[in-house]
Regions:
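Short, surface-exposed beta-strand/loop micro-motifs that present aromatic residues
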Residues: 94-101, 177-185
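Short, surface-exposed coil-to-beta transition loops
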Residues: 107-110, 174-180
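Short, well-ordered beta-strand elements
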Residues: 109-112, 183-196
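A short acidic-to-branched-hydrophobic micro-motif
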Residues: 95-127
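Surface-exposed amphipathic alpha-helical segments
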Residues: 193-217
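Short Gly/Thr-rich strand-loop-strand
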Residues: 54-56, 60-64, 131-176
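N-terminal "mature-domain start" segment
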Residues: 26-98
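Secretory targeting and sorting signals
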Residues: 1-27
Length: 217
């Protein structure tokens, strides 16, 4: 009986060893070339937001095409900004804008991805978003665009985590809102923004997840 008990015990122990999941592999830095894949095309974007996106354009350098009356909200007003991404250690960058047509922005989506030479450099970029926008949540400010139009937006957001920041801006007098997420993943800073009437939160999370899945980490 003692032998049988020993055998059962060994069998149980072996079973436990076989069914214990392996520890997850550590993430590794992304190669600069991932920016060519991390930005989703208009077809994929349309599937995510549930609307036909017939027009898109891409950009390969960070840019800013506006100024805001309240500077603390500058880095929440848009994504892909030089103030955020510009750094001597920025190895590669890519971004895209998609909308329903050249003149129809009922659904408007913007993406930005930057790969840095080091994780620390990417972390600095992330903090140029979160540190410089402290106090923006709850604020309303005018946004003056380069095309000489002015929009007024109210910003709301939760405190950022060590790797993620999300916020919403709503245009004054409308139900139009832009849902934005910023994610720090190893040596990559990625951002996604979905603007539409109603709740674009699920769509922006799905878009950022699709972008993140291409990073090869």
């Amino acid at each position: 009986m003692r032998l049988a008990g020993t055998a059962v015990g060994v069998g149980l122990a072996a079973g436990l060893v076989l069914t214990t999941p392996a520890a997850p592999a550590s993430a590794r830095p992304s190669d600069p070339g991932v920016v060519n894949y991390a930005v989703m095309g208009k077809g994929s974007v349309g599937n995510i937001v549930g609307a036909p996106m017939r027009f898109e354009w891409t950009y390969t350098d960070p840019f800013q095409s506006y100024y805001v009356d309240n500077p603390v909200c500058n880095n929440w007003a848009d994504i892909g900004l030089p103030e955020v991404y510009a750094d001597p250690d920025l190895a590669s960058f890519n971004g895209a804008v998609a909308q329903e047509s050249p003149t129809d922005m009922t659904h408007f989506v913007k993406q930005a991805v930057g790969v840095y030479a080091t994780n620390d450099a990417a972390g600095r970029a992330f903090h140029r978003v979160v540190d410089r926008t402290i106090g923006c949540s709850g604020q309303t400010t005018a946004m003056h665009l380069d095309n000489l139009t002015t929009q007024v937006w109210t910003f709301t957001g939760e405190p950022a985590t060590a790797t993620d920041a999300t916020w919403v801006k709503q245009e004054a007098g409308t139900d139009r809102r832009c849902f934005t997420t910023t994610r720090l993943r190893e040596n990559v800073l990625l951002q996604a923004k979905v603007c539409q009437a109603g709740n674009g939160g699920p769509a922006v999370n799905a878009l950022a997840g699709a972008m993140q899945n291409t990073l090869g980490q």
